[in-house]
A protein has these predicted regions:
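Short Gly/Pro-enriched turn/cap motifs at secondary-structure boundaries
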Residues: 13-16, 40-43, 55, 81-88
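Charged, glycine-rich active-site and insertion segments that engage polyanionic ligands
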Residues: 188-191
Length: 191
């Protein structure tokens, strides 16, 4: 069979500061008790498992695998997003969730492991942003060719041409930057 997963690091009050997370777990025999929440998590409303990052009793960050159906684990969907509407997004809420200790990811603690995953995700996100920018450019170009002012398309005006050229220059710079990063990643030289 197939299993869908999600990655839970971002918290409601600590989105750009993962070190400030408050999600935590405490030892309880062969289990840990997980409390806290995550927000803006892609695939959370239907994921079978969630790789979640939380602090232990010593304030060290660890990854845990939380399975759908565990008591106290809910995944409400976020509605009315303004962007990335093709992906289902939601929250991960942990209310005294009993997670087996065997579900703690071995060998990694601290922020290094989750941030490594984010670095790869951000590379992909850069291409998505470039795609959006390219669509904006195409829309602006089409509009400037169709919009007639004083008997001519506004695309015939030097100021409009300058704005479109600057737009395309910035998009091309972003493409080249992301292409170069991809090349470095393929060569294991991205730092």
């Amino acid at each position: 069979g197939k299993i869908m997963g999600c990655f839970g690091l971002t918290e409601p009050d600590h989105g750009s500061n993962p070190g400030g997370m408050i999600s935590n777990f405490k030892s309880d025999g062969d289990y840990v008790i997980l409390n806290g929440s995550k927000m803006w998590i892609s695939n959370s409303p239907f994921a079978d498992i969630a790789v979640v990052w939380a602090k232990d009793e010593n304030k060290r960050i660890h990854g845990l695998i939380v399975e759908r159906g565990m008591d106290g684990f809910t995944t409400p969907e976020t509605h009315n997003k303004w962007s990335l509407r093709a992906s289902s997004t939601g929250e991960l809420i942990f209310d005294n969730v009993r997670v087996p200790k065997k579900n703690i990811l071995p060998g990694k603690s601290g922020l290094g492991a989750p941030l490594m995953c984010l670095d790869s995700a951000r590379y992909g996100i850069s291409w998505g942003a470039i795609g959006v920018a390219m669509d904006c450019y195409s829309t602006a170009l089409k509009y400037s060719l169709e919009r007639i002012q004083f008997g001519k398309p506004i695309a015939a005006k030097q100021l409009q041409q300058k704005k479109l050229a600057e737009m395309l220059t910035e998009i091309t710079k972003a493409q080249l930057l992301s292409w170069k990063l991809g090349k470095l990643k393929n060569e294991d030289r991205a730092t």
